[in-house]
Amino acid sequence: FSGGDPVHLAEVFADTPMWKAIVQAWHEGASLAGCSAGAMAFGGKIIGIRRSHITEGLGLIPDIEVIPHYDKFLGWLPDRVTAAIVRKDANTALLGIDENTAVVLTDQWRKYGTGKVHVLRGEFELSEELFPYN
C-alpha cells in the first residue's frame, strides 16, 4: 500500500471483498507492506497529522497507530505531532517511524534502516533495535 492519504486508502478499501481477500491472504502467510500512508491505514485508528482528527483505520493491526516520517514531521510540524500524540488512544501503541526506516513483523517486530522507531505506549517511549510488540 503506497503513500498519499491514509484516510482515503481506508475509505476505499474498508469492508470490500478486495480488503477481505488481502486480509485472508495475509493471515495465510502472504507478505503485506505499507509505505507512509499505507502503514498508517493498517492500524485501528489513523492519527491526523494533516487533519486535526482521528479516523478509523483498516484495523489490520487494531492496537497500533502509526506516524511515518516521524523525525521529519517532528521538525516540520512539531505542534501537530504533539497534538496527535496527545489524541492517541490510551489503549494503543503509537509507532513513530523515522525516514529511511522500516518495521517488519514476522515472529517479532524488527526495525531495519538508519532511523529509529519510537514506540509510545501509555506514558512511556521505547526505542530499540528489536522490540517485542506486546
Label every PLM stretch briefly.
Residues 46-48, 52-134:
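C-terminal and late-domain segments of enzyme folds
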Residues 2-3, 10-75:
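Class I SAM-dependent methyltransferase SAM-binding "motif I" and its flanking Rossmann-like core
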